[in-house]
Amino acid sequence: MLALSGCSAHWGCTDTTAERGEAGVRVRVEDVSGRPLGVIAEVVDWRLEPHPQVPDEGDQVHFHYRFDGADEGSGPAVDACAVDEERVALGCRTVYSAEAFGPDGDHTGDDWLAVEHPEQVAGVLLIPNDQSYHGRTCEQDVKDGGGPHPPKPAGVGDRL
């Protein structure tokens, strides 16, 4: 008599995480393998001002950004961070090219970064790694998951 007990085959699943790219005001967006996507992301300008929906919370960072070369309706996403003079992140969020639309079809948008100490903000930087890819990890799916993943999103205290 042949008896089989549960499946114990090892699928050989491996997750890898991309290295975080060099942050800048203008960056070439890259995929999880570090290859350029043909898209440039740029912080056009920024200023400190109260958010119109929560003016009592004081100044926040209001910034404008642009994606050149992005596809209509879908495309990359990058982390935007307000930084101090030492390039330490004071507040970050992911901005999506698909949410950036301006006149004449250009991919421009604006967003807000809430920071604890707005007086310390020296600039807004973008991290070139495309954050729009959300493939399954080995932990989520040992058979079909794994492979390269974008770096962990930037957060407060990260040196960029």
Model-derived features: where do they sit?
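Sec-dependent bacterial lipoprotein signal peptides
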Residues: 1-6
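Short edge beta-strand segments in beta-sheet-rich domains
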Residues: 75, 108-110, 151
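Short structured motifs
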Residues: 45-51, 63-64, 95-97, 108-112
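Mature extracytoplasmic domains of secretory-pathway proteins
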Residues: 49-93
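Short, solvent-exposed, Trp/other aromatic-anchored flexible loops in extracytoplasmic proteins
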Residues: 84-146
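Residues that cap or initiate secondary-structure elements
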Residues: 11, 33, 69-73, 86, ...
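Transition segment at domain starts
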Residues: 7-58, 139-159
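Hydrophobic beta-strand residues in large extracellular and virion-surface proteins
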Residues: 27, 41, 46, 61-67, ...
